[in-house]
């Protein structure tokens, strides 16, 4: 159980080219939020696991917040050993952003696909688009699977070479009926190098998008620093 309380204040501004619906969200906002996570870990190791799974439920609730936003999420990732010391891992990651008061979810609370969950695409430039702005979605889901590639050098024990496949979608715009939902599956495949360092895991990846919406922005190379979950 991992509880957290956050207090934030923000001022939302829009450009002169923003649509009328987007401009309606301009203003100052104050949020006091309570969030928590519940995890169930059955991995055989927290460091480079080769068997088992870990699942996590996440919820963010308003204490005092404009628009009363609520975010629910669930994720699960499993591991299985293959031949030649290779490990297959697959995971699902989901989020939903809504409002307890029935109001529209403002732009800063909307959902974007995490950079590590959809390689081959620019972060924050995938999904619903209002005019020139990518505005995120109310719902988001990803599926990721990868397998480590065997190698023959013991000195590389902190490095994994992997082949991966990513699939993701972010969709629905509650504040406007004229903005397209962008409800389309995005997919990519590629190769990556995961390096475990004292400051955390580093990932270098080369990805090729396989399916996309016409407005999505792609990229071939990606560098990530952060969690492996």
Model-derived regions, located:
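C-terminal outer-membrane beta-barrel translocator/porin domains of Gram-negative envelope proteins
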Residues: 4-159, 163-173, 215, 223-228
């Amino acid at each position: 159980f991992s509880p957290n309380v956050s207090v934030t204040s923000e001022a939302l501004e829009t450009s002169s080219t923003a649509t009328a619906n987007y401009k309606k969200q301009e203003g100052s906002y104050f949020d006091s939020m309570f969030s928590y996570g519940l995890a169930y870990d059955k991995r055989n190791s927290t460091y480079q696991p080769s068997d088992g799974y870990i699942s996590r439920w996440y919820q963010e609730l308003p204490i005092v917040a404009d628009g009363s936003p609520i975010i629910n999420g669930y994720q699960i990732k499993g591991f299985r050993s293959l031949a030649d010391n290779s490990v297959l891992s697959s995971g699902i990651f989901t989020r939903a952003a809504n409002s307890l008061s029935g109001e529209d979810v403002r732009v800063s609370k909307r959902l974007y696909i995490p950079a590590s969950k959809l390689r081959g695409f620019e972060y924050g430039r995938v999904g619903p688009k209002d005019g020139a702005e990518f505005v995120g979605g109310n719902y988001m889901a990803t599926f990721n699977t990868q397998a480590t590639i065997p190698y023959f050098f013991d000195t590389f024990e902190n490095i994994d070479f992997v082949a991966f496949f990513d699939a993701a979608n972010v969709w629905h715009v509650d504040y406007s009926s004229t903005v397209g939902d962008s409800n389309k599956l995005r997919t990519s495949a590629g190769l990556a190098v995961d390096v475990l360092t004292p400051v955390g895991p580093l990932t270098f990846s080369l990805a090729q998008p396989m399916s996309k919406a016409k407005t999505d922005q792609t990229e071939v190379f990606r560098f990530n620093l952060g969690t492996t979950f």
